[in-house]
UniProtKB/Swiss-Prot annotation:
Residues 39-58 have a biased composition (Basic and acidic residues). It comes from the Eukaryota. Residues 29-61 are annotated as: Disordered. Associates with the mitochondrial ribosome. The keyword Mitochondrion applies. It is found in: Mitochondrion. It comes from Saccharomyces cerevisiae (strain ATCC 204508 / S288c) (Baker's yeast). This is MIOREX complex component 6. Residues 1-34 form a transit peptide. Component of MIOREX complexes, large expressome-like assemblies of ribosomes with factors involved in all the steps of post-transcriptional gene expression.
Length: 524
């Protein structure tokens, strides 16, 4: 329902919706599911807590100013383009509060925030005609011909209104028969224009004028038929109802609203959509996890602050565990030193190439990287592939700034291609050499299905599967379409409840990664 409401608001309110280019950099908190033979890595845990994801929207440089009239972009000093943008701007554009152009951090991107429809019963929502979802009442210019004679529509109503029977006030409903009004208007319009319509071709035939049009999309009121009708006559007609406008005296220094609110009158459903500026959204949770500003300046709410603190604590605990593994177990520390030595050799090659091109010396500081610990307990082909992929990602993340700078400095395409192939070949040699030498120690034990490890995501754990057949039979067994029930002490009954790829009862023999390093058998 929210998706349909969003589409309707975008389709019928184009003047209030602005489009802008967003960067694709996104930070997501999700459950990982990496399939591989024996070496897959899953995330499990309590997923009931709400996850928040935000977009790194970035900033537009202050030298570039944008005029929000279609897709017009105005640069400083371009007076001709600026004058054209001012001429093309409509006075009814209320979305940006009569501001023709804004620059820098004042860039706006308004999107609708649609209210939830959970409190509305399905019977009311599915009743077409009574409730039109979130489609509002449209009051706008109707498509009448420009040469229409003023007052003509009023005379049409003047001929019809005496024939309308007013309902007695003593009756309960107190409404006029709208269908009779529509039929009278159609009959009058057809009677007056019957001779002219016979002479005109079919393409120029005009449909009869109806003051309003009721459909599943809402009520559409035509302006022209009621433009010259006195107010006392309109007050007696139904379903129209005039709303008294109360103008409040505002102070001169009153703060202007930062968001546009559109009110559509409906007492049954709270139909008040709100346009939110994404660039000034203060509730983003993952924008800067290590922000040094105090909470009062950053603008986080109390709920988001607690979630942010839980995220930071989970990530710090995960990094602390990884460091403890390296300091506690000598074989992990030695393997990490081996990886660091290989990266140091690659850094020297890049530094020599950079000095040859720019005559500058650089020192690419090495950030300590933790190797995947699943390779110490699983020797399957899937784990080997995941390990090589992880090594390649870590190496490319480390050398990417210097590597791209050297490629952009090389002017000759042949030299840049030669340098690129050289670095790629060297990286492949490093990956092959490390995948053969790491892990230096392998742990094994019979009867264990998966290993559980802490996760950087709050309320989650990582699972490293050691037995592929057990994993396949658990999630893709032959009885996935059967309803299996398991009772506990004749009080609680556990059933599949529509979960398709889970087989009950499930028996998994799991152990912690620390237990594997301390108690399992090993060989070098």
């Amino acid at each position: 329902m929210e998706h349909q409401a969003l589409r309707r608001l975008v389709l019928y309110c184009p003047n209030f919706i602005r489009r802008g280019a967003l960067r694709q950099n996104m930070t997501r908190v999700s459950c990982r599911h990496m399939s591989g033979k024996g070496g897959g890595r899953d995330e499990k845990g309590d997923c009931n807590e709400e996850k928040d994801s935000s977009k790194d929207l970035g900033r537009v440089p202050s030298k570039m100013k944008r005029a929000y009239d279609g897709e017009t972009v105005i640069k400083e000093g371009d007076s001709h383009a600026e004058s054209l943008a001012q001429q093309g701007k409509q006075p009814t554009d209320l979305a940006y509060n009569s501001r023709s152009k804004i620059s820098g951090s004042n860039l706006h991107l308004l999107v609708p925030r649609v209210a939830s429809t959970d409190y509305i019963s399905n019977k009311e929502v599915h009743t077409e005609g009574l409730f039109a979802g979130y489609r509002p009442l449209f009051l706008g210019n109707s498509g009448f011909p420009s040469d229409a004679r003023k007052g003509k529509n009023f005379h049409e109503l003047d001929d019809v209104l005496p024939n309308i029977q007013v309902v007695d006030a003593s009756e309960k409903d107190g409404k006029l028969n709208v269908q009779e009004i529509i039929e009278d208007l159609q009959r009058t319009s057809l009677r007056e224009s019957i001779h002219s319509m016979e002479q005109l071709p079919s393409s120029h035939k005009r449909k009869p004028v109806i003051p309003w049009d009721a459909s599943i999309s809402g009520m559409v009121y035509n302006d022209m038929p009621f433009k010259y009708v006195p107010k006392n006559i309109i007050l007696k007609m139904k379903p129209f109802k005039l709303l008294r406008i109360e103008r409040k005296s505002q102070a001169k220094n009153a703060r202007k609203p930062t968001m546009i609110k559109l009110q559509f009158h409906n007492r049954r459903i709270n139909d008040t959509p709100e346009l939110v500026n994404l660039y000034h959204n203060k509730s983003r949770l993952h924008e800067s996890l290590y922000n040094t500003k105090p909470l009062q300046e950053s603008g986080y709410s109390s709920a988001n602050t607690s979630k942010r603190q839980k995220m930071l604590k989970a990530r710090s605990d995960f990094e602390h565990k990884q460091k403890n593994y390296a300091y506690k177990h000598t074989f992990i520390k030695n393997d990490q030193e081996l990886f660091r030595n290989e990266l140091t050799k690659l850094n020297k090659i890049l530094a020599r190439e950079f000095k040859k091109l720019t005559k500058l010396s650089i020192h690419n500081e090495f950030k300590r990287e933790h190797l995947p610990l699943a390779v110490y307990v699983s020797k399957s082909k899937g784990t080997k592939k995941l390990f090589r992929r992880s090594l390649k990602m870590k190496i490319m993340d480390h050398i990417y700034p210097v590597y791209t700078t050297i490629l952009s400095t090389l002017t000759n395409s042949r030299d840049s291609k030669k340098f690129e192939n050289k670095i790629k070949a060297y990286i492949e040699k490093i990956i092959v050499r490390l995948s053969d030498e790491v892990p230096s120690t392998y742990f094994f034990q019979d009867g264990v299905d998966c290993i559980i490890q802490p996760s950087p995501i709050h309320n989650f754990k990582r699972m490293h599967w050691l037995r592929y057949t057990k994993r396949h039979n658990t999630f893709w067994g032959r009885t996935i379409h059967k309803d299996v029930q398991v009772s506990f002490n004749d009080k609680y009954v556990v059933t599949r409840s529509g979960v398709r790829y889970t087989r009950y009862p499930t028996n998994l023999n799991t152990q912690l990664l620390e237990t594997a390093f301390e108690e399992w058998d090993y060989y070098e």
